[in-house]
Amino acid sequence: MLTARLLLPRLLCLQGRTTSYSTAAALPNPIPNPEICYNKLFINNEWHDAVSKKTFPTVNPTTGEVIGHVAEGDRADVDLAVKAAREAFRLGSPWRRMDASERGRLLNRLADLVERDRVYLASLETLDNGKPFQESYVLDLDEVIKVYRYFAGWADKWHGKTIPMDGEHFCFTRHEPVGVCGQIIPWNFPLVMQGWKLAPALATGNTVVMKVAEQTPLSALYLASLIKEAGFPPGVVNIITGYGPTAGAAIAQHMDVDKVAFTGSTEVGHLIQKAAGESNLKRVTLELGGKSPSIVLADADMEHAVDQCHEALFFNMGQCCCAGSRTFVEESIYREFLERTVEKAKQRKVGNPFELDTQQGPQVDKEQFERILGYIRLGQKEGAKLLCGGERLGERGFFIKPTVFGDVQDGMRIAKEEIFGPVQPLFKFKKIEEVIQRANNTRYGLAAAVFTRDLDKAIYFTQALQAGTVWVNTYNIVTCHTPFGGFKESGNGRELGEDGLRAYTEVKTVTIKVPEKNS
């Protein structure tokens, strides 16, 4: 049984981490029962109960049992957090007067602390989210550390320029922080999404009020303690735990929040955009849902394409906004591809996420679990051919067998709607123009992939597919160096890379009258 106690002394948490490494293997042993050190709201570098004194349970998806209870923030708590963030952002505050290079040093210090506590954080993520420890440790924590270091390097390099202009004038631009930024993150990659949003916002000098997903609050709260330990001034980062319709809506509607960044469903994205428009026209960036196509041409490396399309869908239990959730295969190789795909899905190890050879853990919660099973039943009802999986695994926790559907038609709901689970629909196509039209026939446009040995065809697909990211002969390659975001209803704006900084700065033009201008 995985259990955890609340509010234990920090020393006990440190003891749990320092003894966890295995000297016999590159991958350290996880901590199956990580102690829970923080369960309150983090406002102004202090821990607070919710104003209402309410709490809510966070559940271990591996067992379905409650790990502990966390403060349930709402509008009153958001008001306090925004007030703290606004004070930290006032002219003359320690944060506003801090050198840009010092902001970078603090971000690097935060990365150092994450690296120090990597095993503990990965274990906490696996406990609360259900993802396999090997993925939490190797993939997620690696990305978290890199994203803080990457934007630390940008802190003193993101600046304006001088502009030659007519007349007796001197002109330059300033890249100024937007101000108080509301950030709302999802449950599928809690620490990664926290880093994607915090790092560029802090590198450019903003202050933050972040609402973390109610399903996975624990790792974000622990990282808040590292923010304080790193030396960030009070009020610069504030972390609220609570529900979307209360705490999340309060951030989106708040008249003293200058920008909101949201990652989550397209449906909630519409609500965020509407709330921003009906309040103070705050800046908005949205990273939303997807129904991303993976297109396999007849000349592709078959084994590689099968492997990549498998991971494109089943990675992170299918709970990935850019999951390759529509696999289009050219007719001449469809049968062989289908057989290999089904065999690979059957071989995928589903089980305890703390076991190092587990490839797939549970879905994040009961609601998501039941939603996915509902889509599987719907696919069967609509006439898609269930080739493997299609049911829960075991009687405990929220496990679903890897599921593959064949002979899926474009009009089926499993072909059009975001399932967000381990369900891979396979489609057959004959011609390139046909599959491009079908791939683009969706309200989404987050990502796409094409598998081919023909460079001319590959380049043509990268131009024709309506998606913010197009991969060629690979999938899910997302790094802190490259911009990420969607077309159409998959969102607006970009995160990561140099483009990710633009969302957190305003460009100010300064023009000065000079008595005499010389070149």
Curated annotation (Swiss-Prot):
Pathway this chain belongs to: Alcohol metabolism; ethanol degradation; acetate from ethanol: step 2/2
UniProt keywords, alphabetically: Acetylation, Mitochondrion, NAD, Oxidoreductase, Transit peptide
Entry-annotated residues carrying N6-acetyllysine: K53, K54, K366, K385, K401, K416, K428, K431
PROSITE patterns the UniProt entry points to: ALDEHYDE_DEHYDR_CYS (PS00070), ALDEHYDE_DEHYDR_GLU (PS00687)
Major localization listed first in the record, in broad terms: mitochondrion
Pfam families membership: Aldedh (PF00171)
Residues marked Transition state stabilizer (site): N188
CDD domains: ALDH_F1AB_F2_RALDH1 (cd07141)
UniProt-annotated catalytic positions: E287, C321
Group of enzyme by EC: oxidoreductase
GO MF, one example: aldehyde dehydrogenase (NAD+) activity
Family: Belongs to the aldehyde dehydrogenase family.
Name of the featured protein: Aldehyde dehydrogenase X, mitochondrial
Species of origin: Mus musculus (Mouse)
Gene from which the chain derives: Aldh1b1
